[in-house]
Amino acid sequence: MEDTTISIRALEPTDIDLLYDWENDPEVWHLGNTIAPFSRFVLEQYLVNSHEDIFSTKQLRLMIEYNDGENTAEAVGSIDLFEFEPLHRRVGIGILIAREHRRKGYAKQALKLMLDYCYNTLNIHQVFCNIEADNHESIRLFTKLGFVECGHKKQWLWRNHVWVDEIMYQHFDHHK
């Protein structure tokens, strides 16, 4: 999956250092409901099993790469599908862009590619995401792409000794 500057690809063993850094950054733990660091061994095992089919694991993690046009590709983030329900034709989506690559449009491009993949390859009817109410950049990103708010969970997450609301958004494939 790719467009002019962004491609989405499967995980490779060479991604271990990036995944280790991203998964062990306490500033983003709350996004994945993580409360402890991941060992390199655990992440290596995850990579070994990452080839398994989304229909059996109900989840899929892919890497987002930026291509500068000179055959140089750099991993700038990851994108996840989770809670895949083929019977009900829905899946959750989450995205992480490395801090130094944010605000460059990569997330928007990657999400467009993944929505196309969900609707045209996985035959999904709806994609959903859960965003903390104070994550204004993510809310703006997802709503610009046509996600609509469908639920507001009050005091859903406990973060830094404060309750945080979580908002659920949905995006529908209106062509099927």
Pin down the residues of each PLM region:
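Short structured motifs
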Residues: Y46-N49, G77-I79
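Surface-exposed charged/polar residues within alpha-helices that form helix-capping/stabilizing sites
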Residues: D21, N49-E52, R99, D116
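Acyl-donor (CoA/ACP) binding surface of acyl/acetyltransferases
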Residues: M1-D15, E70-K176
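A generic structural motif
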Residues: E65-N67
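A short helix-loop-beta-strand connector motif used in the catalytic cores of GNAT acetyltransferases and
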Residues: V48-M63
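Generic structural signal for secondary-structure transition and capping sites
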Residues: I16, E27-V28, E52-F55, N123
